[in-house]
C-alpha cells in the first residue's frame, strides 16, 4: 500500500542495510529473507521544510518471524534504519535490530517497548538481543576520479541504552576509470571480532550470539557472510561491458573463526586463506542470466576448498 511518500506492506523483502555494496554487519542478503510487516518513508521536497537537508532522509522499519534450528520457535526480528543526507555527497545512517519473543518469552506491549527503546540487559526482558550502530558514506572527485569512502560500526551489546562492543567495516571505491567501459574498483576491510570491554564483557564468541538468540535466519548469519569472530580484506571490481552485461570480480584474504571456537557456524577450527570470485550477469529483457565461479584454498564445514560454479536463470512473464 502506498500513501504519498510512504509504503506499507507484508512480504518477503531482501534488505541490505549498509553503504557497502557487498557487506552489512547487521542485515544483508546472506540469509534468506523472512515474511515481515514493513514500512518505508522518504523525505520529499513537497514536505516544504526550509532547509534542503531536512527533506533528504529515509526511514525503514519491519518486524518478522525467524526460522532457526537453535532459536526459540517463532522468535521475531525487529529492525529500524534511518538515512540522512545533511550535505551533498555525504550520507549518515542509524540502524537498530532486536530479536525478541518466541515460545517461552514475552511478546506483549512491554516486550515490544523494550525492543524499541528499552534497556534489555536486566529484568524480565533481558532475553532480548539488540544490535545497533551507524554508518557513513562520502563521495568526492580527485583528479577527475570519483571516489567514495564508507564505513559501518555495529555494537553487539548496550551500556546505558547505547551500543557497545563494536564490529567494523571500512572501505573505498574508485569509479569510471575508462571512457569505453563503466568500471568500479574497491577495497574493503570487514572485522567481526570483538575484544573484551573494560568491564570484562563481550570478547570472543560475542558477535552474532547471545544467551537466547543466534543472530541467524535458517541458520545463516543475518549480517556479514564471514559470520562472527572473523575478518576479511578484499579487492573487488565491476565492469559494465554493455548495457545488458556486467562482470564482477574479487580477491580477498579471510580468517574464519579467529579464536578457534569449536561451536562456530562456519568452521569448527580456525581457517585462513584466499577467496576469489568471477561473476557475470546478462539482462536480456524478460530473461536474466547469472553465472559465478569461486575459488577458495581453505575448507569450511559446508564447503570444500577448490573451484565452485553456480548458474541461475530468471524469466519474467
Which residues does each predicted region cover?
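Exposed, low-structure sequence patches enriched in small/polar residues
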Residues: 90-98, 102-317
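Outer-membrane beta-barrel channel domains
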Residues: 1-86, 182-189, 206, 211-229, ...
Amino acid at each position: 500500500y502506498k500513501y504519498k511518500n510512504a509504503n506499507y506492506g507484508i512480504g518477503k523483502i531482501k534488505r541490505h542495510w549498509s553503504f557497502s555494496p557487498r557487506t552489512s554487519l547487521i542485515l544483508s542478503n546472506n540469509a534468506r529473507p523472512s515474511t515481515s510487516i514493513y514500512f518505508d518513508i522518504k523525505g520529499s521536497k513537497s514536505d516544504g521544510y526550509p532547509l534542503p537537508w531536512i527533506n533528504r532522509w529515509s526511514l525503514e522499519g519491519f518486524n518478522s518471524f525467524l526460522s532457526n534450528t537453535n532459536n526459540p520457535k517463532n522468535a521475531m526480528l525487529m529492525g529500524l534504519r534511518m538515512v540522512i543526507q545533511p550535505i551533498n555527497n555525504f550520507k549518515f545512517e542509524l540502524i537498530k535490530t532486536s530479536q525478541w519473543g518466541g515460545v517461552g518469552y514475552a511478546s506483549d506491549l512491554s516486550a515490544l517497548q523494550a525492543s524499541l527503546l528499552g534497556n534489555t540487559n536486566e529484568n524480565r526482558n533481558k532475553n532480548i538481543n539488540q544490535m545497533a550502530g551507524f554508518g557513513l558514506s562520502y563521495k568526492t572527485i580527485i583528479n577527475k576520479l570519483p571516489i567514495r569512502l564508507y564505513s559501518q560500526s555495529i555494537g553487539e551489546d548496550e551500556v546505558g541504552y547505547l551500543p557497545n562492543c563494536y564490529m567494523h567495516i571500512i572501505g573505498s571505491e574508485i569509479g569510471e576509470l575508462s571512457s569505453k567501459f563503466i568500471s568500479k574498483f574497491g577495497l574493503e576491510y570487514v572485522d567481526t571480532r570483538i575484544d573484551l570491554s573494560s568491564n570484562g564483557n563481550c570478547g570472543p564468541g560475542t558477535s552474532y550470539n547471545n544467551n537466547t538468540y543466534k543472530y541467524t535466519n535458517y541458520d545463516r548469519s543475518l549480517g556479514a557472510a564471514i559470520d562472527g569472530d572473523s575478518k576479511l580484506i578484499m579487492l573487488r571490481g565491476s565492469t559494465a561491458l554493455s548495457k545488458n552485461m556486467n562482470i564482477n570480480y574479487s580477491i580477498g584474504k579471510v580468517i574464519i573463526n579467529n579464536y578457534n571456537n569449536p561451536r562456530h557456524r562456519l568452521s569448527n577450527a580456525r581457517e585462513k586463506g584466499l577467496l576469489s570470485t568471477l561473476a557475470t550477469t546478462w539482462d536480456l529483457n524478460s530473461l536474466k542470466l547469472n553465472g559465478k565461479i569461486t575459488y577458495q584454498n581453505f575448507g569450511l564445514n559446508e564447503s570444500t576448498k577448490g573451484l565452485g560454479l553456480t548458474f541461475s536463470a530468471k524469466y519474467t512473464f
